[in-house]
Structures are given as C-alpha cells and as structure tokens.
C-alpha cells in the first residue's frame, strides 16, 4: 500500500481530568471564539459540532483549501445532544411546530460539512458511522484515497457523552466497571513525507465478533508478517485498557434488555482488560506497554485518541520506533493500527 504520512494532529480530549459532577471523563474544551470566529455560526452549533469543527480547523491551520483533496470524519453515536433535543421537542409539541435546526444539526455528516463550508473546501467529503470501527473505516478510506493519488486528506473522529446516554448505557450494563469518555481528534495525512512528517501509518486491520485470546494473537502475528515484522520488532505496544470506575457501581440496578445481551456484558466486565494483559505477556514481553483510555475514557472512536497520543509522545524519539495499537470496543469491534516513527 502507498505510504501514508501524518503531517499535523489536533485533539480535544479530557486529559485524564475528572469532573465531580459528571460520572464520566469530560473533554477540556478550548475558547471557541478564537477558532470559529463567526458568532452566529458558533451559536447554532451544539457542543460536539463545536468540538469537531474547532479541532478540524486547528489541524488544517493555514493550509490552502485547494490542497485538501478530502475530508473524512467518523463517529460512533453522532450528535447526541441535538438528537435528544429534537426528540424531546417532538414529544413535548405532540409532533407539531417543530424547529428543524436540532434535526439538521444532529445528522452525522454535520461536522465534516461545516469544516468544508467554513474553509471553502470543494472536495470528497465522507462520514463513517460503524460503531467501534468508525475511525478505522475513515482511516482506511483516507489511505485508499491517497493510494489513488490524493495529496492531502483530513481525517477526524469525534464522539460525545451525555447524562442521558450514560444513564442508558449503565442500565444496559455496557458501562459496568468501565469509565466512559469523549473527545475529538483530527489528522492531516499526505502522500509525500515532506520535510518533517510526524509519523507514518504502515497498516491497519479490523475484525469483529467475540474472539479468544489465541485467535487475536494469531491475527496480530499475521498482520505483522504482512508488514514484514514480528513481535520482537515492536518497540511500543499500546492497548485500550480501561480504568475501573472510581464511583459507586450501580450494577444491581442494571437492566438487561434480552438474554442475547448477557454474553456481551459478561465479556465487558471480565475480559476487557484481561485480553490486553495476556497479549502484553505472550506476544510483547519486551515492548514498552502503553494505554490510553485512562486519559480519554471509553467511547466508539477512542482509538483516534490512541493514534494522537503515540504520535505526540514519539515526537522526541531518537531511534526508529514501530508502534502497534490494539483496541477493542466492548470486546466486539477489534482494530490493529501499525505506526512507524522514523528519525
């Protein structure tokens, strides 16, 4: 596959900070007035739209719009606040005299479209909503576009958490023992390395379904072999270990919707971190072990924060470094991302 280089990165994330008034990690947001300068446009944006648009604009910087051949965004749950607002209004007004703005702003492609409109980028614009593999799908699309000849592609992922969504996921048992989070990350990818690329994306693979540790190990080994590597060549191994919740566990009050949800909840509570620990011990005992969800929390596109973190932390590397990121979302959606940092 055509080499793909990361030229710029931007992130809005919780930074590991906890808000006592929220049972999840909440993103530390910047002053949007300095990034989204149009006050009318900014006022109409919901919180996640402002997060995503500001992060994307920061990543683009002063790059001329004609040099960007595509904007590809990803989200697992979309604009939850606007969706909730529209549905509540629908109920309160008995389906009459509805304000269309929350509905328009709640569509999944809103963020990519707003970035294109603000910067005047008339190019390929796509949004992926593939649950826990949304970011990986967007990244793979960007790599294929670059392989077809595109110069610069802007790739981003974002998800927000709301009190309503958190309460629902807790009742379903999805967040038992898991600290939820949110955030937005953007990456400017290019075909050419240029003078100072931040890193190179060497490969990506996704797979879905319940997997045993042995099956995951075999997939990782085959993935590395296809990229001319073995487990001893990986200097950094980053996993999605999730920090256990520090507040009261309300598991006794959780509601399981149907019997088919029981295996999923058992996997989340007992196997989530165990899979990562077994891989660290069995495949990468000599690699440096890193994690990222203790800083950003669990959300469908959290793997985008993992990529941002390894690129940021590898800036001062003095030797070539191979970095493998393995993440699974609720033990169902699995992804492998191979990154190389050259000197």
Show the residue positions of the predicted features.
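Conserved "HGTGT" condensation-loop signature of ketosynthase/thiolase-family condensing enzymes
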Residues: 1-124, 128-136, 144-150, 158-343
